[in-house]
């Protein structure tokens, strides 16, 4: 009799454990109930940056009040846009702005890593200028960057005292990839490697224009040099490898606000961890 009872108990326990685990990997979505006076929607944006105009759009949250706003910073060249995340964050009551850097995907101007950082600063300025029409709560703007966008996120946070939070997903630490390169010829050979990206026709710049600054100004590209400037920021770094461990340790050692570094079993765009990623971001936004 005891054996007969124990077995179903074990089975039920395993079922409940599996069910609970499945629950943690799920997310419940429901359609937005429109505010008739100020419904959620999407608006194209044309954002000035330098002497160029950036193409972008805003997923506007529902309701007439000003909303906290998440800025999505894409990678190199920017195939993964994380718009699944954007839709859920918007349903959570946030605006989400996506834009293409200068010289990428049709935005005007010349592409460059430093320009990307400057573009983020200019997008934040655009948010301030248009906060009433776009219903942006400029006291609560958060950056989310993927790959090169993770590098851009950490660099831009250093220049934006009013932005307190950032998520750096699978950060491309550009300096680490090229710190041992001594000549421009060697640099361009590496940059042209298809496994490292190669020549993207969607970027309005030559490989020389894009990568030569890394050789000329390595200190700027070394994210560890800016760790002290992130002391008061709330930062999450997520990776699919541990290549950024030393960088994360450097930031954590100086951070006095909030810092979390995790390595997940996934690929570069976090293909099998979309729900877990979205849930972590929502929790972070609610902090």
What feature does the model see in each segment?
Residues 134-147:
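Alpha/beta-hydrolase fold nucleophile elbow
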Residues 112-134:
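Alpha/beta-hydrolase active-site loop
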Residues 66-75:
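Short beta-strand element of the alpha/beta-hydrolase
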């Amino acid at each position: 009799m005891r054996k007969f009872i124990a077995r179903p108990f074990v089975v039920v326990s395993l079922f409940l454990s599996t069910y609970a685990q499945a629950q943690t990997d799920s997310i419940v979505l429901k359609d937005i109930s429109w505010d008739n006076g100020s419904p959620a929607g999407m608006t194209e944006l044309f954002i000035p940056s330098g002497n160029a105009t950036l193409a972008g759009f805003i997923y506007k949250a529902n309701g007439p009040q000003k909303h906290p706003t998440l800025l999505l910073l894409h990678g190199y060249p920017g195939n993964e846009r994380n718009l699944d995340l954007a839709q859920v964050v918007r349903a959570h009551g946030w605006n989400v702005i996506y834009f293409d850097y200068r010289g990428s995907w049709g935005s005007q101007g010349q592409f460059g890593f430093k320009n990307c950082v400057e573009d983020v600063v200019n997008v934040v300025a655009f948010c301030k200028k248009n906060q009433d029409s776009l219903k942006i709560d400029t006291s609560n703007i958060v950056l989310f960057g993927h790959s090169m966008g993770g590098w851009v996120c950490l660099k831009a946070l250093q220049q934006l005292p009013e932005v307190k939070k950032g998520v750096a997903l699978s950060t491309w630490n550009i300096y680490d990839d090229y710190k041992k390169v001594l000549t421009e010829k060697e640099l361009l050979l590496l940059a042209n490697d298809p496994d490292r990206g190669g020549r993207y026709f969607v970027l309005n710049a030559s490989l020389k224009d894009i990568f030569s600054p890394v050789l000329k100004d390595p200190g700027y590209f070394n994210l560890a040099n800016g760790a002290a400037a992130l002391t008061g920021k709330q930062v999450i770094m997520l990776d699919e490898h541990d290549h950024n461990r030393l960088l994360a340790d450097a930031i954590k050692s100086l951070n006095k606000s909030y810092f979390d570094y995790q390595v997940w079993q996934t690929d570069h765009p976090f293909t099998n961890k979309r729900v877990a990623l979205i849930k972590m971001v929502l929790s972070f936004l609610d902090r």
